[in-house]
Amino acid sequence: MKLLLIRHGDPDYEIDSLTEKGHREAQLLAEKMQHVPVKAFYVSPLGRARATIDYTLKKTGREATILDWMEEFPATLNPQESIGLKNAYGTHKNTVNRVVWDMLPEYWMNHPELCTKDGWRTSEAALMSGMPELYDRVAKGLDELLASHGYCREGKLYHTEKGNEDTIALYCH
């Protein structure tokens, strides 16, 4: 099976849609995607992903399934609530509700637990942002999606009784 992970076009975050450039990118993508034998289309519920896929759906006469777990990963934290996290974002003006992946590289390098398979789950950043629960929600959603196409998780691997050559497209973030 082939998974196509497609990021939305150039975003206009203020209106949760696309810029003029993003609309053009989505149109060009649709020109290519109409020739790809996609078995199923899936899309994030957010406007910029939906605006991106709309061109492909119109071009192909197809529909997409909206999957809530494919929204942009919403883990945020307030670094002001922790002495250890105050310097994670530098001197940026916005000091509350920061997304976890915007931390400075220096912070990541000084906290190697963030880069380990299980260590990140108990890190201060993860616990303050609710990241483990959000991650588990996404992992569960992906497992369910893959199972619906015949691939079931067994530990760290996916197992299938009968493989397939299906292509599925996920329009997300």
Show the residue positions of the predicted features.
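Extreme N-terminal starter segment of soluble prokaryotic enzymes
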Residues: M1-L4
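Short polar catalytic/cofactor-binding loops
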Residues: H8-D12
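Flexible, glycine- and charge-enriched loops at secondary-structure boundaries
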Residues: I15, T19, Y135
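Short catalytic helix/loop segments, enriched in acidic residues and glycine
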Residues: L18-M33
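Alpha-helical packing segments of well-folded alpha/beta enzyme cores
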Residues: E25, L29, A49-T52, L134, ...
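Phosphate-coordination/substrate-recognition cap region in phosphate-metabolizing enzymes
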Residues: E31-D118
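Surface-exposed cleft-lining segments at the edges of enzyme active sites
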Residues: R121-R137
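Active-site-adjacent alpha-helix immediately C-terminal to a catalytic or transition-state-stabilizing loop
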Residues: P132, D136, K140-H173
